Curated annotation (Swiss-Prot):
It comes from the Bacteria. The keyword Heme does not apply. This is Large ribosomal subunit protein bL32. The keyword Ribosomal protein applies. Keywords: Ribonucleoprotein, Ribosomal protein. The gene is rpmF. GO terms for biological process: translation. It holds the Pfam family Ribosomal_L32p.
Length: 72
């Protein structure tokens, strides 16, 4: 296995790690319901993307309610 020939100095180590940083996700506001959502993603509250309804949230809510009734 390959090994480094010399130890990395503190300054070189810092320069190496300078580009290793986390970026915050791009959060925007949904134009339909004004809830926060990730950009380029459908809204998880109202199910719209780019002005169109792509997820039927009423059907999902009904399915969830039926499932919870069956467990009780």
């Amino acid at each position: 296995m390959a090994l480094p020939k010399r130890r990395l100095s503190h300054s070189r180590q810092g320069n190496h790690r300078a580009h290793v940083a986390l970026t915050a996700p791009a959060v925007m506001e949904c134009p339909q319901c004004n809830s926060p959502k990730l950009s380029h993603q459908a809204c998880s509250v109202c199910g719209t993307y780019n002005g169109r309804t792509v997820i039927d949230m009423e059907a999902i809510a009904k399915k969830k309610a039926d499932k919870s009734k069956g467990q009780q």
